[in-house]
Swiss-Prot record:
Involved in the heme biosynthesis. Catalyzes the aerobic oxidative decarboxylation of propionate groups of rings A and B of coproporphyrinogen-III to yield the vinyl groups in protoporphyrinogen-IX. It comes from the Bacteria. Its EC number is 1.3.3.3. Pathway: Porphyrin-containing compound metabolism; protoporphyrin-IX biosynthesis; protoporphyrinogen-IX from coproporphyrinogen-III (O2 route): step 1/1. The record marks 173 as: Important for dimerization. Keywords: Cytoplasm, Heme biosynthesis, Metal-binding, Oxidoreductase, Porphyrin biosynthesis. It is an enzyme of class 1 (oxidoreductase). This is Oxygen-dependent coproporphyrinogen-III oxidase. Residues 238-273 are annotated as: Important for dimerization. GO terms for biological process: protoporphyrinogen IX biosynthetic process. One of its GO terms (molecular function) is protein homodimerization activity. Homodimer.
Amino acid sequence: MNFAQVKDYLVDLQNRIVTGLEQVDGQSFRRDTWDRPEGGGGTSCVIEEGNVLERGGVNFSHVFGKGLPASATAARPELAGRAFEAAGVSLVLHPRNPYAPTVHMNVRFFAATKEGAEPVWWFGGGMDLTPYYGFEEDAVHFHQACKDALQPSGEEYYPRFKKWCDEYFYLKHRKEPRGIGGVFFDDLNQPDFATCFNLTRSVGDHFLAAYVPILQKRRDLPYGERERDFQAYRRGRYVEFNLVWDRGTLFGLQSGGRTESILMSLPPVVKWRYDWSPAAGSPEAKLYTDFLTGRDWLPLG
């Protein structure tokens, strides 16, 4: 296990992604370095009211402490009483154009140590796409990039992590997926550190190729008030998932993380409506019938 090596990679990944996104948007991200009083800190890179991105954040954090919050030890009682160290890059991008999908990507490393005992460590991460108006070619492209990221580690990873993503990014109280998925993994520590690190690194390294071509293709499509209205309504689902179900959000808030950085994933303009559903056969209804289905996208390619 080499924590310093992972941290160096994550800092570099954040810089590469922010630079790539600045080239697409034409506006700069605000870089905000912060310290965590209990140990650690990070850098939040945020764009608001950009040319393409209405709001977006690319966050690096490295936190450590003497004990873990309840959200971490509930599922893993063996971690109770151990010191911890965690580092990760997490991003969410909300484009202004409703035809351009929201995207989330995260790669992280966690280690818990205790004197006289072997360290407990694991990697986690993934990326997933949340369209408002879906395009099959975008879904295929995104899932192919996810598969390409995992292919060097073995054929078995993509189907496993794709299924995991569909199950994780699911709003149980709505009985619907958050988006069209991608890949998701957690607790990855087999067969060894180097293999797990390589896999996680490949996911991070494939992000720009997975998302930027879609953003470029959709950023200038004409839209009106109707599309913006539906986008704001569907963004409500994003808020619901992040605040009710997302383990990373809960861990961050319970472990004394930086609230501004944790909640930068939330969209800037959102609407809720009582008991609303789109008209049958409408472009808005197509999102539900054709895209929010947990289907396998790659045979289409």
